[in-house]
Amino acid sequence: MSEPKEPSPALACAAQDGSGLPEGWLQVQSMDLDAQGVARRADGKVVFIDGALPSEWVSASTYRKKNHWEQANLTAIHRESAQRVRPGCPHFGLHAGACGGCKMQHLHMGGQVAVKQRVLEDNLWHLGRVKPAMVLRPIEGPAWGYRYRARLSVRHVIKKGVVLVGFHERKSRYVADMAQCPVLPPHAAALLMPLRSLIAALDAHDSCPQIELACGDSVTALVLRHLQPLSVGDHARLRAFAAEHGVQWWLQPRGPDTVQPLDEGGEQLSYALPDFGITMPFKPTDFTQVNPHINRVLVARALRLLAVRPDERVIDWFCGLGNFTLPLATQARAVLGVEGNAALVARARANHGLNQALAQNHRVLAATDFVACNLFAMTPGMLLGHGAADKWLVDPPREGALALVKALADIEQSRRGAQGATALPAGAEDWVPPRRIVYVSCNPATLARDAALLVHLAGYQCAAAGMVNMFPHTAHVESIAVFERG
């Protein structure tokens, strides 16, 4: 790639609106969710350029053409963005074999946050016709060493005579040849090369496709997916590795429900929410947030925005292990956690019991219950069955909370007597919708869809929204939004 060149003053003036650039040059206007620079040709066709940043003037080579858009590889930068920085990892880039785990290391962190905030606001407006009354300050944290969970692929490359352990190559099914990873905690990143040697030494080295990493505050667990039984010798090698590197091994011979520790009796994985005096034990395959620092800030921010009073009842939808439920129980009169996975419900109850037992007199947890319910099949009748609550906390997976918010909207439409509204069970007219909803999202598109239902059909206003930089250097957008009754 050529070195950036300073344009002449005349060229700079001519190109302020993207016109007048030399033939073949493109002015990058923005960045999309796949971290591609977005430009337009003179005929209006959109060009998505790998590796290009907003405000840059570039040349690019097209590798995919459609009627209204193209995808292209960056070939030269003629004017470089002031926010272009040197990547922090030698495995990041556009070169062959580059790791695909990160997409934005070449963009200054302030630029990454700005791109994600714009993506959030654009999705809310263009997909949902929703404009927040206030944009929240972004939640930010460490740029490196933040990723406490990772799914590492394993591949025995026979032609090279090596075992690779890491993320997939950029736009490829192959495993990147990576010796380090600065987004992992240092103690976890230091395991990459020893893991390669370990897997190569196993009798089952050809049948171990994946290692899942899960770090707690003081324990690191590794889940080995193996497609054939491990030999006695393999068990011994795993134990020796665990002793040398201070990790726990868990084995997964089939599906997720088959995961078991190699040896019983080890210290339990857990993380703390110190602002609330909460300790959260978890299993390595349980869903927990990738970034523990951001999670602590996010929980505190969500509860401040919800502003729960001691006389209020709160429902935490998609509650998981109780990441929000238990902190809510330090503030509310009563809390209900609703989760689709019955096993998680059982562990959430156990976590509540543990923290209740550890609670000091000034921090006894509120009356708290957990129930299992398929939240993707929610109906107005089911929603009414959970009872009224003053406030809701909603933290769905990427699919969003469509059935839940649609049930709420259907109830509101029926109460208003809207034409074609769903008929509700007797007594529904006495049900009171929540005054405030705090919605934590990991997908801005489904957030926008659900926000549209809440605002346009359920009688809410979007009081605030902002991005949460849970995944620095990646294109993933976490966000938080507040909805209040109009």
Curated annotation (Swiss-Prot):
Single annotated GO MF: RNA binding
Classification via SUPFAM superfamilies: Nucleic acid-binding proteins, S-adenosyl-L-methionine-dependent methyltransferases
EC number: 2.1.1.190
Protein known as: 23S rRNA (uracil(1939)-C(5))-methyltransferase RlmD
Organism: Verminephrobacter eiseniae (strain EF01-2)
Catalytic function, reaction form: uridine(1939) in 23S rRNA + S-adenosyl-L-methionine = 5-methyluridine(1939) in 23S rRNA + S-adenosyl-L-homocysteine + H(+)
Chain positions recorded as [4Fe-4S] cluster binding sites: 89, 99, 102, 181
Signal peptide (residue range): none
CDD domains to which the protein is assigned, alphabetical: AdoMet_MTases
NCBIfam families, per database record: PRK13168.1, rumA
Family (UniProt): Belongs to the class I-like SAM-binding methyltransferase superfamily. RNA M5U methyltransferase family. RlmD subfamily.
Keyword Cell membrane attributed: no
PROSITE patterns per UniProt: SAM_MT_RNA_M5U, TRMA_2
Domain TRAM, residue spans: 14-76
Active-site residues, record numbering mapped to chain: 442 (nucleophile)
Keywords: 4Fe-4S, Iron, Iron-sulfur, Metal-binding, Methyltransferase, rRNA processing, S-adenosyl-L-methionine, Transferase
